[in-house]
Amino acid sequence: MEAIKTARLPGRCRSCRTHRVYPIDVRKYPGIADTKTGKAFLAIAPNKSEENMQKIYDILNYAAFDQPNEANLTAKDLVNDFGGAKVKEAWSRNVETAEKYNDPGTFTTLIGWEWSSNNRGANLHRVVFMPQGGDVANQFIPYSALDSDDLEDLWAWLDSTSEKTGADFVAIPHNPNISLGLMFAETRLNGEPVDAAYARERMKWERNIEITQIKGDSEAHPALSPNDEFADYEVYDFALTPDGARPAPTKADYVRSGLKTGLELEKKVGMNPFKVGFVGSTDSHTGMSSAEETNFGGKGSTTQCQKNEHIQPVSVPLKVGIWEQQDGLAYGQKVILSQSLFDAFQRKEVSCHYRSAYNSASIWRL
């Protein structure tokens, strides 16, 4: 949440051992400090030492999975203590900020959020955005994984909210590579097989997919494409579980094999649920663009560069060892407006912007 300050001293993610994390300083926010979660945090971590921040991060990680933790918190506690009015307040601030800085044709903002489903450690996150402004966005509270971690429930909510408010939505799945075999699965989360109705709903909302970002590349894996010498490009296989497990890759985790599965399903059910365009992203959650070498925002607060630090090609010490190269996005449209951006995504006239020695992008239409 934008207005909640982060602690100055970070902990480290147990999954990768290097990713720095920044739990909130609950003492500054009575609405959180007075909750069961807030009181537990204050008792366990009375100061903002790195050791204490690590404790808080570990508690959040284990509580989210309803696993034993030092504070005896559950996932339900987190929902009760961080949901409700706090979500509405944060959403209103985000909408207000987007409206404030929107300058159509010069700097176009889009209102959206991340539906962060983490089904048993499987990354099923969807980034959702809309072309409409605050007058529409303030008519609803974003649907989150706290409401449901089943993507079909998200689609149903998008359907009903679109009908009620007139909002149009685009949902983009990201990080298939750590989806634990669920992103391109032939079986739905409810155990039923993928059918034509499922395929229609998925293609209605999810016409593109993220193929590469800082948490690795999702196009291919050397174990699945042994004859492709480039399939080992930026492999990242840490699951989003507290123990940082590294499960074996499956064909349902990677775009190349997922496209093939889609063609097979089209023969079976009459429609392809995985006929998607490709985008590349940062997943930095900073809001800073990194499209210019002379104005590089970094992959996060630990890798931000000072002014002019990267004007010349130099060797920069690695500050965060787990992240891969972040990527960019291009789209096929002459005018940078929120509606034209939305339309380009609907047409799948978007691109994966692989980063290398030079900035380059291609537009794909599938």
Label every PLM stretch briefly.
Residues 1-366:
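Extended, charged catalytic domains and RNA/DNA-binding interfaces, predominantly
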